[in-house]
Amino acid sequence: MKNGNHKINLIPIVESILSIDPRMRFVAIIDLKGNISEAIMKEGKTSLKSQKEEEHFCKQVALRRKIRNEFNKSLGKVGYVHIEREKVTQVVVYPKRKTVYVTMEPNIDTKRKLEIVKLIKAKTTQL
């Protein structure tokens, strides 16, 4: 997974996450400052947000992670965040040095969503 510069090649990870379920829409790996390190939209899907909105949203994801971290000592670390919207389901997973942001179709049952979260965590433990 690492190249000559000891950096992890994120493309195979993002592609692997996107292939977990056919109803996956978008996967982004975000650094702790909110910059998109790698992102892929599933072929045939269109973004519900413009590129500028997507970048702004990723900055907000990083900011919310910082805010949630303030409560780690009293409440424990966040395992993942699951947001249900009318048009899309959003999931955010927090590996150590990156944040994984995923969108999927909203019509997936809860049990399958939990399976997807577990698979994402397994694929991103090294991040």
Spell out what each predicted region is.
Residues 1-127:
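Non-catalytic interaction/Regulatory regions outside core domains
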